[in-house]
Curated annotation (Swiss-Prot):
GO terms for cellular component: cytoplasm; cytoskeleton; motile cilium. Keywords: Cell projection, Cytoplasm, Cytoskeleton. Pfam families: CFAP300 (PF14926). The keyword Nucleotide-binding does not apply. It is found in: Cytoplasm; Cytoplasm, Cytoskeleton, Cilium axoneme. Disruption phenotype: RNAi-mediated knockdown of the protein causes reduced swimming motility and velocity. Display a reduction in the cilia beating frequency and an altered cilia waveform. Show absence of the outer and inner dynein arms. InterPro entries: CFAP300. Cilium- and flagellum-specific protein that plays a role in axonemal structure organization and motility. Plays a role in outer and inner axonemal dynein arm assembly. GO terms for biological process: inner dynein arm assembly; outer dynein arm assembly; positive regulation of cilium beat frequency involved in ciliary motility. Belongs to the CFAP300 family. This is Cilia- and flagella-associated protein 300.
Length: 252
């Protein structure tokens, strides 16, 4: 379900302050991103915000976020009009429930991954993305039998969205024959984006984060390719918001 915000006046207004983000400073992560053709396309920005996050009214938060000068000056793939504030944003709420990678056990159960190896298939193209194995079919080819491995609820998990970015890669991508590297680095990116907390009264962990898939920023940004994505991840107890951007950069 996509939501279109409007610029309604509320009693609160958020301010945002740029913070250093070290997710992309990890040498091994950058090496694998280079292998997957993502080293120049994937970006992560972090900001502090000043007042309590109202999860019942994400519209106001997102409008204030993308109208902030600090945020506008930090994003890589949005063409904001100077001195023109946004009044509308189309976005889709995502779920952040996963604390393990068991979402991807389905790949083994459905024989897309066998003993850690990704099952190969005849090569085809989808939106200039090379589809040469059944994993990529399961991610983006809606008319394939592999696509039904993940249901709609699975696909609206932030964990799934991050996994898809890494698996599909960029135009100059050296794909993996085995699944483990995709799982390991999805876990790394997810772990460093969301806020995991422990319940006060029991020894269990939960994710204290809210995530949003930004579909369109009025006259400034539109997601028109499977790899053109922007996710906003709000960590209320830390008053930190992370913005993950990726673009399909054409090499030829």
């Amino acid at each position: 379900m996509q939501i279109e915000s409007d610029n309604q006046v509320t009693n609160q207004s958020y301010s945002f302050f740029r913070q250093e983000n070290t997710i992309l400073d990890d040498k091994k992560f950058m090496e694998i991103l280079q292998k997957w053709g993502l080293q120049h396309s994937i970006k992560v920005s972090t900001f502090l915000f000043d007042i309590k996050f109202d999860h019942l009214n994400p519209n106001q938060f997102l409008l204030d976020l993308f109208n902030s000068k600090d945020v506008r000056g930090s994003l890589h793939y949005v063409s904001f009009k100077q001195n023109v504030l946004l009044s509308q944003i189309k976005f889709q709420p995502l779920t952040c429930k996963s604390i393990k990678l068991d979402l991807f056990d389905k790949l083994t159960e459905d024989k897309i991954v066998v003993k850690g190896h990704i099952k190969q298939c005849f090569e085809e193209q989808f939106e200039n993305i090379q589809i040469a194995d059944e994993l990529r079919k399961a991610l983006v080819l809606e008319d394939s039998e592999q696509y039904c491995v993940f249901n709609e609820a699975d696909r609206q998990e932030l964990l799934f969205k991050l996994f898809q970015i890494l698996v599909l890669g960029g135009q100059l991508c050296q794909y993996e024959d085995e699944i483990q590297a995709y799982l390991d680095w999805t876990k790394y990116l997810y772990k460093n984006t969301v806020n995991a907390r422990k319940y006060a009264d029991k020894d269990e962990i939960y994710i204290d984060s809210y995530a949003y898939d930004i579909r369109k920023l009025e006259n400034s940004y539109s997601s028109d390719h499977p790899q053109n994505v922007m996710y906003v991840v709000v960590n209320p107890s830390l008053r930190i918001v992370n913005i993950i951007e990726n673009q399909w950069l054409k090499v030829w």
